[in-house]
Amino acid sequence: MSERHLPDDQSSTIDPYLITSVRQTLAEEGARLQNLSKQLDSGQYQRVLNLIMNCKGHVILSGMGKSGHVGRKMSATLASTGTPSFFIHPAEAFHGDLGMITPYDLLILISASGETDEILKLVPSLKNFGNRIIAITNNGNSTLAKNADAVLELHMANETCPNNLAPTTSTTLTMAIGDALAIAMIRQRKFMPNDFARYHPGGSLGRRLLTRVADVMQHDVPAVQLDASFKTVIQRITSGCQGMVMVEDAEGGLAGIITDGDLRRFMEKEDSLTSATAAQMMTREPLTLPEDTMIIEAEEKMQKDKCLNVIGDQQGK
């Protein structure tokens, strides 16, 4: 196997114009998005949102090439925010995947030209099944648009690509339309963070929204009595490996906590440590939350109170 040589970043220089080109492209696509928001047909969007909201089956996306990639993302966003959805490849549809479609499903077909052959071939079958069709296209007079129940136009003069060939602006606009529809449905369905977490249990957000204090709290936290000496406190914090120790009163209730930070602050202001007791060093009334408190609520409370430790209380006190 021949050795591969990685390119040297210093072996060639980039024409400064290319950085200008990057800025120009971002500005142009941003301007096209602004233009779309101004020219959108509110009647068509109202019809589309009603179709999605009243769909009894799945919202199915389909598109070829780059439009297909965008369709997959749109479908994933809808599905993860409360609108059942999946993507079907138009070419695969003619080799058995049409069986995935039921009369209760709503189809969103994506084609910038509105004349993509593989997409148009789907239309007769979909009409025969009785499915409603939404077209996302840049050509309101196209064959696809004429056969759709609702049409969302891109209102795009040309692609940002200097050759007006590579799908660039069209995919950006289509992606934005997908996001806009999904967000409208989130608001219509009153889709809340807890609902979002049900579909994202493996992500960090899902963990924060589904996990309770009891699920992550440390048990067997070291404890000392109110009259414990400075040396005893140090020993218990060190052996506990949790950076803190709880201080218990005579009845075994929580009187306070002592953290590494509490020790440092106490040592800075006290000259004599040999006679110091836990009662003098501890933080009284530490942040205490019921064990069934959601982690996201606990984190917000800890940030607000500027503390690194929270005590989980079975009694909810």
From Swiss-Prot:
SIS domain sequence ranges: 48-191
InterPro entries on file: CBS_dom (IPR000644), CBS_dom_sf (IPR046342), GutQ/KpsF_isomerases (IPR050986), KdsD/KpsF-type (IPR004800), SIS_dom (IPR001347), SIS_dom_sf (IPR046348), SIS_Kpsf (IPR035474)
Entry's Gene Ontology BP terms: lipopolysaccharide biosynthetic process
Residues with site note (Catalytically relevant): K66, E118, E159, H200
Binding site for Zn(2+): H89
UniProt-recorded Gene Ontology molecular function terms: arabinose-5-phosphate isomerase activity; ATP binding; metal ion binding
PROSITE patterns: CBS (PS51371), SIS (PS51464)
Catalysed reaction equations from the record: D-arabinose 5-phosphate = D-ribulose 5-phosphate
Enzyme class at the top of the EC tree: isomerase
All residue ranges annotated as the CBS domain in the record: 217-273, 282-317
Signal peptide (from-to): none
Residues the entry annotates as binding ATP: G63, M64, G65, K66, S67, G68
Residues the record lists as binding substrate: 82-83, 89, 95, 121-130, 155-157
EC number(s) recorded for this UniProt protein: 5.3.1.13
Keywords: ATP-binding, CBS domain, Isomerase, Lipopolysaccharide biosynthesis, Metal-binding, Nucleotide-binding, Repeat, Zinc
Cited Pfam families: CBS, SIS
Entry function: Involved in the biosynthesis of K-antigen capsules. Catalyzes the reversible aldol-ketol isomerization between D-ribulose 5-phosphate (Ru5P) and D-arabinose 5-phosphate (A5P).
Subunit text: Homotetramer.
Membership in a protein family: Belongs to the SIS family. GutQ/KpsF subfamily.
Name of the protein: Arabinose 5-phosphate isomerase KpsF
Organism, scientific name: Escherichia coli
